[in-house]
Amino acid sequence: MKITKTITYFERPGPENTADCAALAVERATELGLTTIVVASSGGATARAFAQAVSGTGIRLVVVTHAVGFSAPGVWEFDADLAEELRSCGHAVICGTHALSGLERALSRSLRVGGGSRTEAVAEAFRRTIAVGLKVAVECVLIAADQGAVGVTDEVIAVGGTEEGADTVLVIRPSHTASFFDLQVREVVAMPRNR
């Protein structure tokens, strides 16, 4: 058996692709009978766009934000009022340590310890050879699985972007970070051609 699907390629990465990504994510979730879209959103704009796109579809969002302290010590960048609004609609808003950096980044930045890490090498390989959005989408699924917001047996739609907005849509079978090599990127629905 084979499946033939169209992949959407954006000319360049960036937030101008967010609306298209939201529509494509909902469309592919509906086609596959999936009920969860995992989406990265640092401040809330992308989460808001996706919440509008899934309204009335029965699809649940798992919004994964930057960890507290990512931009500055003790600061959560996400719009707290929007988080409450999304939760009241049945969506999840979670934050967790970046699965593909976290403690490793502290070690590689240290002048005493120094050097790159294997985990950061995996992240950089995703960013450089495929797409930043793919790295983000994979990482968000790992975080969501580790937080218990998604299971590891059912596929999800995963959405990431480059700096702001969304530009990559994937179908992923999740795993926990500790079982990283069990994660499967099963489909690329959309991604930028140029990085």
Please describe what each predicted stretch is.
Residues 32-35, 56-60, 88-91, 150-155, ...:
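Short coil/turn connectors at secondary-structure junctions
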Residues 27-79:
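N-terminal active-site beta-alpha-beta segment that forms phosphate/nucleotide-binding
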Residues 36, 126-160:
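Internal active-site segments that recognize and position negatively charged phosphoryl groups
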Residues 3-7, 59-119:
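Long, charge-dense
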